[in-house]
Amino acid sequence: MLKNNIEVDVKVKCIESGITQVQLADSIETTSSYVNRVIKKKDGIINKTFVRMMEELGYDIALIYVKKKVE
């Protein structure tokens, strides 16, 4: 099972970065409706088969976010 709530994670990271989802979509050259659809889709981020494989092996999945270092 995916332990993260992707929708909340993206919204929090947008707030931390001081941008909106619309601005995020613009910066990655896509639409805000597509960004919204991706983060709301339950199996859109992690492949369902991968989740089943990890569950069968006795694991849950937890994503961690590491801030990129600016040089």
Set out the residue ranges of the language-model regions.
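A short, Lys/Arg-rich alpha-helix, primarily the initiator
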Residues: M1-S17
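Helix-turn-helix DNA-binding elements, focusing on the entry/boundary residues of the two helices
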Residues: Q21, S32, N47-F50
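Short alpha-helical "recognition helix" segments of helix-turn-helix
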Residues: L24-A25
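Recognition helix of helix-turn-helix/homeodomain-like DNA-binding domains
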Residues: E29-G44
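DNA major-groove recognition helix of helix-turn-helix/homeodomain DNA-binding modules
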Residues: K48-L63
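Short amphipathic recognition helices of helix-turn-helix/homeodomain-type DNA-binding modules
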Residues: Y65-E71
